[in-house]
Regions:
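Conserved FAD-binding catalytic core of PHBH/FMO-like flavoproteins
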Residues: 62, 161-263, 267-270
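C-terminal helical "tail/cap" subdomain of flavin- and related membrane-associated enzymes
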Residues: 318-409
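Conserved N-terminal helical subregion
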Residues: 3, 63, 75-178, 186-191
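N-terminal FAD cofactor-binding segment of flavoenzymes
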Residues: 46-88
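Glycine-rich FAD pyrophosphate-binding loop
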Residues: 25-50
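N-terminal Rossmann-like FAD-binding beta1-loop-alpha1 element of flavoenzymes
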Residues: 6-33
Length: 409
């Protein structure tokens, strides 16, 4: 029976878990990543339908890791964001709000990247790092944690000892459950359909989010005449739309999108997943910590889920690396509390904002629409407020980790 001792064992090989492994491995820590996915699926285009809007902080981190140069040619900058009311009520004028790169310190607002290209670039870097052992097609069957060490038993009989376990296996999380971490879960009774389509009319680097009564529809530009869509509806309606044949689905999508891109055609398969707000009662225990979707699932209305997870990665990596250099026990609560306290305000703020935005914008109540319309009119005329929102969305405000500033640890 094979046994191994490492500094950190990471359960879950998604983008967040893989990024953490790479940063820690490049800084001298011995890492094991346990991923239930098969390796051949990682590079199968049919396996991926998601795309991500990376903010400046996330791009800075990827640049430090020399990943940005690999994916840059596959990325698509967003120069303009249009927020638009999808339906008017009574005599209320539908609102529109426009953000352009004039409000950004850079010449873009976000960069769109398809999940497959980002994951492939990270894995290629991991494969070249001798400090990282990446175990594919592996599942944890037993998880033991005591005051001095941790032990994981895999389904192939392999045993892994480590100073710290990081749960990055999404939600619901088997690792968090085994560690005794409980989550508070609130269902929005909504589901999102995601995918990629080709279109006739160029997007001109414009992202559009249309607020419909049953949920938001986001159309996000990709390289070429292609865009990613995230279409959120009440679950019953989402199921109906998802089960349509491709022709009828595209007709309904184009109608909801107000035919802004002309003729459209599906490029990827489409996928659907339920939307919920999920937060843990705590993110750390002795020798155990959770990050990414395992620590917080938020509404996709602002497209900030991955950026929030990357901020987790940057903060945890900085805490662990600097603590290890000081000779501290990286699995101790003393060290992990630094991470927990650092991330609390940011996560709470994003959770509150996304929850509030969904309730306000996806509501057919007359008074709420009226108030929203007035608010957006005032916001559209205020450069100061727009600058504030762009600054917050950039991931560069507040007490941020060094990696998000583009600084090495």
């Amino acid at each position: 029976m094979k046994q191994k001792k490492n500094n950190v064992a990471i359960i879950g090989g998604g983008i967040v878990g893989s990024l953490l492994a790479l940063i820690l491995g490049l800084n001298g820590l011995k890492i094991t990543v346990i991923d239930r996915q098969k390796k051949d699926k990682l590079f199968s285009k049919n396996h991926y339908v998601k795309s991500y809007a990376l903010n400046q902080g996330s791009s800075n981190l990827l640049n430090i890791l020399n990943i940005w140069d690999i994916i840059k040619t596959k990325s698509q900058p967003i120069d303009k964001i249009l927020l638009k009311q999808g339906s008017s009520i009574s005599s209320i004028q539908p609102f529109e709000l426009i953000f352009s790169n004039d409000y950004s310190k850079n010449n873009y607002l976000f960069h769109m990247i398809e999940e497959i290209y980002l994951k492939k670039a990270i894995v290629e870097k991991i494969d070249k790092c001798p400090n990282i052992e990446y175990l594919y097609s592996s599942n944890v069957v037993e998880q033991f944690i005591d005051k001095n060490s941790t032990k994981l038993v895999l389904d192939n009989g392999q045993i892994i000892y480590s100073d710290l376990i990081v749960g990055s296996d999404g939600y619901p999380s088997s690792s968090a459950k085994k560690a005794g971490i409980q989550h508070i879960n609130y269902s929005y009774n909504q589901s999102s359909i995601v995918g990629i389509f080709k279109h006739e009319i160029p997007h001109e680097s414009e992202a559009v989010q249309i607020f419909l009564p049953s949920g938001p529809l986001a159309i996000l530009p990709l390289s070429g005449n292609r865009s990613s869509f995230v279409w959120t509806n009440e679950t019953n309606e989402a199921v109906r739309i998802f089960n349509l044949n491709d022709l009828n689905f595209l007709n309904e999508l184009n109608t909801a999108f107000q035919n802004r891109r002309g003729q459209i055609q599906l490029e990827s398969k489409k996928s659907m997943f339920p939307i919920s707000l999920t937060i843990p009662k705590k993110v750390i225990k002795e020798r155990f910590v959770i990050i990414g979707d395992t620590a917080h699932k938020i509404h996709p209305i602002a497209g900030q889920g991955l950026n929030l997870g990357i901020r987790d990665v940057a903060a945890l990596a900085e805490v662990l690396i600097l603590s290890r250099r000081l000779g501290e026990d990286i699995g101790s609560k003393l060290v992990l509390n630094k991470y927990s306290k650092w991330r609390n305000l940011d996560v709470t703020s994003v959770v509150f904002f996304t929850n509030f935005a969904n309730k306000i914008f996806s509501n057919d109540n007359f008074l709420k629409k009226f108030a929203t319309g007035i608010g957006f009119k005032l916001l559209n005329e205020s450069k100061t407020i727009k600058n504030y929102f762009i600054s917050e969305a950039s991931g560069l405000s507040g007490d941020i980790p060094k990696l998000l500033k583009g600084c090495k640890l």
